[in-house]
Amino acid sequence: SMGGTLAELADRGVAVSIVTATRGEAGEIHNRDDADAVRHRLGEIREAEQRAALAVLGVQHLEYLDYRDSGMMGTPENAHLEAFWNADYMEATGRLVALIRKYRPEVMTAYDPFGGYGHPDHIQVHRVGTAAFFGAADLGRFPRARFGAPWQPDHLLWSSWSRERSIGVRKAMRGETNEELEEELDEPASGFLSRFLSVRRDVAPY
């Protein structure tokens, strides 16, 4: 998990900075009797939760791109004018470029091309994150006066997980399955086949 990776890096004294595209305003609410009562401040609640979680992990720097949560694919939230899914590509990339130049990371991470399980904002993080990785050193597209001094991170890693391992875990959790569910488990629309994963980290101690 990225949480384990962040905790490990922080424990080793590595400076870790997190950039989050949205505050999760369109997320699901499962632990309230009256979800509508907190819906209007869900972004505020989730930001507080994230800051508390990062403090436990030892991460000191958190920045937001300040877009709105786009909701799950195919929901009305996708059409919101302020949703990250609808963000101007160069504008969003520029916001991240400015933060890369501010924090000057050696390694960047972003979601895989399919956004893990297909969330619109995760897909957009892949697009914008990959573009910003290359754009951070590009003064032609992102001039110094507006975005700061150029910087080129050494590595960009796309975060994903083993589809085969995910299938095994899901089958173990669900026990006996019918034929239709078995087919769904065999070809889930998430993760990557193991042969395409080039970097693995064991974060079990964290």
Question: Where are these predicted regions, by residue range?
Answer:
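Metal-dependent de-N-acetylase/amidase catalytic core
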Residues: T75-E82, N86-Y206
